[in-house]
Amino acid sequence: MSEAELLQAVEAHRWLQSLRLRPNLVTSGVVPEARLVAEESALLDPLNLTGAHVLEVGAANGFFSLAARRRGAARVVATDHLAWTLPGADAQSATQWAAHALDLEVETLALDPRGLSADFGSFHVVLATAFFEQLFNPIQALRGLRSVTNRVLVLETLQNELADVRPMMTAQSRIMPFGGADGSWISGWAPNPPLMLQLLRDLGFNRVLYRNHPTLGAARGIYAALLPEAPDGLLAGFEAPWINMTSPPAG
């Protein structure tokens, strides 16, 4: 594909994420490349993905799925629901095209995480970003993620009520940059860390780690939840600023 053909193909899509397809070509996504690169480091640096099976939920244009393949994952499945299914959304086809342009094998599937079950399969790493704020029933979706996780779940989300020690979440509504030409109003939730810890413990994760978002601070949080069968060696990569919310480990 010539540079002119590549540029024409890029301009044919509406991009949610800024993907670097060539040294001098970055898609004009809503989320800037610098933020995505910082998020990739925060989300994936603690993990050795060599040979891993990875599921991404809320993939948008697949930035982190593509990163997982670069980091040696043997299988990567990128999924999204709203950004890939609302009328006029083309984020799934953009993801497929980007994977082709980068010569990276990533499976794509439009999927509502609330419908996930063990029948879908099992993944060493399940990654979910912008999670709670895009789902009317995020707890049901969290159960779905648990059903397909066999080692670690990494989850990034909007947060609120950070000063309250009680587990809680607050309702959120905002325009998201997909669907119609002017975007779509999406209603969801913003949990606080005590709620996230309680939910993840209730679902059987016995080690829960936390860090603030690398560029947005405590307004967004990143959680890594490990199952009892996950080897203790997985904890070695979670150095500061990660903190262990379940130290000493539960159960």
Labelled PLM ranges:
Residues 131:
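Hydrophobic adenine-recognition pocket in adenosine-nucleotide-binding enzymes
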Residues 114-116, 123, 127-128, 136-251:
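S-adenosyl-L-methionine-dependent methyltransferase catalytic module, highlighting the catalytic core
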